[in-house]
């Protein structure tokens, strides 16, 4: 064989190494991209959870007497009669809107995520709203938050759960 000539086996080996390197690179890239998007959705869920729990216990909603009017016209569904004091009438009105869950979760700020909330005293659950995520399902990602507040001069806990199915674009 003369100078500068190449065997077919060398060409095949070089091509195989090159293709293997590309496959490895693409696999690593896809894995990193998937992780990035999962983390991004987790951050969005955390922002939604914080916003919802703050709005519910700190804001009366918009308009402030939304529970007395046409509920579909309300822009925001805060539950507070004053900061950290929950109105019984507002939570009862919100609970009655469970049949309008999809539009309500949008107005509450959950966006593309699902939402569940409950108001509990020391012994039982007083009110519930939304769809509870299945914590036994490994494909369900759930973020939870709890806020203390007053209801009729008693301490209650508002539990908020924002959840989504992992890997599914919500």
Regions found by a protein language model. Give the residues of each.
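N-terminal single-pass transmembrane signal-anchor helix
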Residues: 1-29
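Long, compositionally biased, intrinsically disordered regions
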Residues: 23-170
């Amino acid at each position: 064989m003369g100078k500068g000539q190449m065997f077919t086996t060398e060409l095949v080996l070089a091509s195989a190494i090159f293709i293997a390197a590309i496959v490895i690179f693409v696999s690593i890239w896809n894995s990193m991209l998937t992780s990035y998007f999962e983390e991004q959705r987790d951050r969005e869920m955390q922002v939604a959870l914080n916003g919802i729990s703050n709005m519910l216990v700190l804001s009366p909603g918009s308009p402030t007497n939304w529970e007395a009017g046409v509920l579909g016209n309300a822009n925001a569904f805060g539950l507070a009669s004053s900061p950290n004091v929950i109105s019984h009438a507002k939570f009862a009105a919100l609970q009655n809107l469970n049949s309008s869950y999809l539009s309500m979760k949008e107005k509450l700020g959950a966006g593309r995520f699902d939402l569940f909330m409950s108001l509990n005293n020391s012994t039982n659950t007083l009110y519930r709203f939304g769809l509870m995520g299945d914590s036994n399902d490994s494909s369900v990602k759930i973020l939870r938050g709890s806020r203390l507040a007053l209801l009729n001069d008693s301490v209650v806990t508002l539990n908020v759960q924002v959840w989504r199915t992992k890997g599914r674009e919500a």
